[in-house]
Amino acid sequence: MSDSHLTAFDKASKAGFIIALGIVYGDIGTSPLYTMQSLVENQGGVNQVSESFILGSISLIIWTLTLITTIKYVLIALKADNHHEGGIFSLFTLVRKMSPWLIIPAMIGGATLLSDGALTPAVTVTSAIEGLKAVPGLSHIYQNQTNVIITTLVILIVLFGIQRFGTGFIGKIFGPVMFIWFSFLGVSGFFNTLGHLEIFKAINPYYALHLLFSPENHRGIFILGSIFLATTGAEALYSDLGHVGRGNIYVSWPFVKMCIVLSYCGQAAWILANKHSGIELNPFFASVPSQLRVYLVSLATLAAIIASQALISGSFTLVSEAMRLKIFPLFRVTYPGANLGQLYIPVINWILFAVTSCTVLAFRTSAHMEAAYGLAITITMLMTTILLKYYLIKKGTRPILAHLVMAFFALVEFIFFLASAIKFMHGGYAVVILALAIVFVMFIWHAGTRIVFKYVKSLNLNDYKEQIKQLRDDVCFDLYQTNVVYLSNRMQDHMIDRSILYSILDKRPKRAQVYWFVNVQVTDEPYTAKYKVDMVGTDYMVRVNLYLGFRMPQTVPRYLRTIVQDLMESGRLPKQEQEYTITPGRDVGDFRFVLIEERVSNARQLSNFERFIMHTKASIKHVTASPMRWFGLQYSEVTLEVVPLILSDILKLPIKELVPVEDSEA
């Protein structure tokens, strides 16, 4: 990558600053909506909190944001970019060659990030709409929680419904809206603290440590489950690195952190001033003058929608990366926006909608959702820490230092995990079950791919070159197609799957002018689009290796058209002049793509466990995108052929012929 690109990635700009606010900080920026409310309610209400409890809580929030978000993610993780892309799967691609078992933390981290992300739209939008309870004139309507639920569901239906059309048209307002949001957090928080400037003593970590062991803290270490809500968006910050660049995050994070901390301090000051008032409203909304609350709710709802949109888009990207890493089933992907970064996966969109809606209906209030929120993301952070340790070692950090630094973060995050574990019985089990289901699917898909690689036989193409030439010239067979294209997951040097040669020569001899053998390899770089060609010493057999980035669409026909033109222009491939055509000068014949589906046979080579893996993978395939759609072949001529997975050493079953009685008597 050139220095100019590196500079562009690392430098900041005014426009990049605003864009970063709209894309990166939606989740962490809406945490003030519910974090203090969770702390106060779990302590027994505003009447039950003391000054030392409030100081300790704010201190815990400040130092959690500092240690996890600022130091681990902004200062360390952002340096672990894979060609300017971030996130747990990008990090995995950087270190996967260091140890084969690293696929495990990558799968677990990706699954928990997806499952917790399904809860984010529910908790943020519900929290924002519940703010209407504090608005004079509307409070009598929204005191009925059913009205809150209905309004929330309507917003979610619209939000998930517009995904298919692309969100670029509304994405332009995300940055300015979030700038107003963060500015409001900072300004309102600052004015609320003016009457209680002692709240800024919370910057001293003494108050954080004191609260953890204080008898005033009714929940003990489990208070960290609520504190962790303040930093759940840190992982999303790293995942969105590629959208805005490292420099813009470096510049925007201090502003965001200052505004968030001021908001928490302002809410804390309001609690101290009203702890004997008996008010049980959400401190976030209650700390604002009543005449401004309707505007605040509107702004909070917009911020919640933006945060939800960021999580939805992030989920699409995460699943897309997992599919191209061959650890997730293939689902149909469309690109409704103007660039490749705006993708849409219908199945994932509606699964997220179903999970989010069920969460709203099952938990009903944001307080109940908060009780379940954050458990899975602690696991994601632990998995990221494991991968980061290997990255630091790979980049030359002394192993002892890498182990010590990451052990510190792992210890902190493990404590948060233990503190959040109590959430399992308060609804966290739903998120854990969803995460386990995703991990199971990933494991089945990955293990099934490895089994296929283990058993499928390969043959040397050179050994069958003469037979293919004879078939090509044999006019006794009708021309099957001018160009026959085979897509193969496995192709190394001149070795190709036995099933492909079986299809050409045995199953039904396929006479063609040119035989294409195409292998798509996903690279660690996100936007690679390169190819390599081997003519196998002929002008009628072409081996093509397509190297596509993990964020590139694998639409093979589009790439193949370019490759054909390049080969003809260079003289390596004869022109295929057409006698009958409506396109003057057309010199490329027709194409037929042959897809070979491998199914488990009854041969005995597979163990019972391997057979379970393959049968389960086959069942999952029924609800996934067909290879035809995945490779962009829906408008091409395609033949699907089924072959058994095991093609060697099939044992003969003993059987005897029954001789007719009259023949035996003769």
From Swiss-Prot:
Protein name: Probable potassium transport system protein Kup
Origin superkingdom: Bacteria
Species of provenance: Streptococcus pyogenes serotype M49 (strain NZ131)
Membrane topology (UniProt): Multi-pass membrane protein
Similarity comment: Belongs to the HAK/KUP transporter (TC 2.A.72) family.
Gene this chain is encoded by: kup
Transmembrane domains' residue ranges: 16-36, 58-78, 100-120, 141-161, 165-185, 221-241, 253-273, 294-314, 343-363, 373-393, 399-419, 424-444
Subcellular location: Cell membrane
GO molecular function: potassium ion transmembrane transporter activity; symporter activity
Keyword match Ion transport: yes
Entries under InterPro entries matching the protein: K+_transporter (IPR003855), K_trans_C (IPR053952), K_trans_N (IPR053951), Kup (IPR023051)
Main localization of the protein described in the UniProt heading: membrane
Membrane is among the record's keywords: yes
Keywords assigned: Cell membrane, Ion transport, Membrane, Potassium, Potassium transport, Symport, Transmembrane, Transmembrane helix, Transport
